[in-house]
Regions:
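Functional beta-strand-loop-alpha-helix junction segments that form "active/interaction loops"
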Residues: 95, 183-221
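Bacterial Sec-dependent N-terminal signal peptides
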Residues: 1-21
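Gly-rich Lys/Arg/Thr-decorated short loops/hinges at beta-loop-alpha junctions or inter-strand turns
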Residues: 84-88, 198-209, 245-250, 322-324
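Active-site His/acidic residue clusters
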Residues: 126-132, 204-212, 221-225, 229-234, ...
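Structural motif
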Residues: 29, 199-201, 236-240, 283
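N-terminal catalytic scaffold of extracellular/periplasmic and nuclease hydrolases
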Residues: 20-167, 172-189, 289-350
Length: 350
């Protein structure tokens, strides 16, 4: 508790230069699952040596280990970033004593923020789940979906429809969520006039971008930002490029690069919005690196890279963090992933 108080005081100090009457900032948190520097570089070299991340105002490095393991998984790292505590691999939204902890999304919601989550995995996958769910096993997808149904998140977009309407317990959560409207396409999502919308994009896991996944992440994010902005309230938006990680596990560079390119295009759209809005803090990082990827050859002229992997699992290497917008200087430096929560909380409670 004392550590938390000291950290909040330290993080609040740069905020004193802003007026006490200044409007609460929007926060867009973007996570490239499995996205290390080599994944970013592979996407960049495959895109005429350019990445939208070059537009970031501040850059740092993040330590990713879990409570008892040097190599984290997405559940533990997601919980660290979302709630500021270390926990065991596989555990979502609970500390090392299995005590539920409040996430930054839940704190922002309780402060009057609009909230939204978008993922290119199922919406009940470990990283998005860590922002609204409390379970001992990341694989308890039915329970995670049940907790999402009671979370009061305004907008959620991702795969995994079967965990809502084709469940072992025979419940149909979509019918139970009578205060939500459910979209069946991006066009339908855009048309619906409601402050609570679910868009379950695939019955199970979404396919990869290289396999033709639609709608695109950038289109889903732009549509969601437009909805959030229309309520004239601050908002918290979590965006996960989930399948950079999946390609890394398969040592499949086509999958990795196609996901990286889509994530990078989405970063560009988010930066465009933030630069125009002038009251949106954007934070972009990864939960961990996947595959131990190295770029060993290639050709800039042809935008080609030759990659090698040392693993089909996660690694313990630090991952980068990028930021833009008001208070983005807070995210400079080298620090633990739990401090991302501390810094975001300091912005919200200022």
């Amino acid at each position: 508790m004392l550590r938390k108080l000291i950290l909040i005081i330290v993080f609040l100090s740069p905020l004193f230069s802003f007026s006490q009457d200044s409007k609460a900032p929007n926060i867009i948190m973007m996570i490239g699952d499995g996205m290390g520097l080599s994944q970013i570089s592979s996407g960049m070299y495959s895109n005429n040596n350019y990445t939208s991340l070059e537009r970031s105002q501040h850059v740092g490095l993040i330590k990713t280990h879990s409570f008892d393991n040097l190599v984290t998984d997405s559940a533990a790292s997601g919980t660290a970033m979302s709630s500021g505590v270390k926990t065991y691999n596989r555990v979502v939204g609970m500390d090392e004593n299995f005590i539920p902890v409040k996430s930054i999304l839940e704190i922002s919601r309780d402060k009057g923020y609009m909230t939204a989550i978008i993922a290119t995995s199922t919406i009940v996958h470990a990283t998005p789940a860590s922002y609204y769910s409390k379970v001992k096993s990341r694989y308890d997808y039915n329970e995670i979906a049940s907790q999402l149904s009671k979370s009061n998140i305004n907008f959620f977009v991702g795969g995994g429809e079967k965990y809502f309407n084709d469940r072992r317990d025979k419940r149909n959560l979509m019918n139970e969520m009578d205060d939500y409207s459910f979209a069946n396409s991006l066009e339908n999502f855009i048309e619906i006039n409601s402050n609570k919308i679910g868009f379950l994009t695939y019955y199970d896991d979404p396919i990869g971008k290289h396999e033709g996944r639609k709608p695109s992440l950038e289109d889903m994010v732009q549509a969601t930002i437009k909805k959030l902005k229309s309520f004239n309230k601050p908002f918290f938006l979590l965006v996960e490029g989930s399948q950079i990680d999946w390609g890394g596990h398969d040592n499949d560079s086509e999958h990795v690069i196609s996901e990286m390119l889509e994530f990078d295009r989405t970063v560009g759209k988010v930066f465009n919005f933030a630069e125009k809005d002038k009251n949106t803090t954007v934070v972009i990082t990864a939960d961990h690196e996947t595959g131990g990827l190295s770029i060993v050859d290639g050709n800039l002229e042809d935008s080609k890279v030759v990659n090698k992997y040392v693993s089909e699992d996660h690694t313990a290497t630090m991952v980068p963090i990028f930021s833009l917008g008001p208070y983005s200087s807070l995210f400079n430096g080298i620090y633990d992933n739990t401090e991302i929560f501390d810094k975001l909380e300091a912005i919200i409670i200022k």
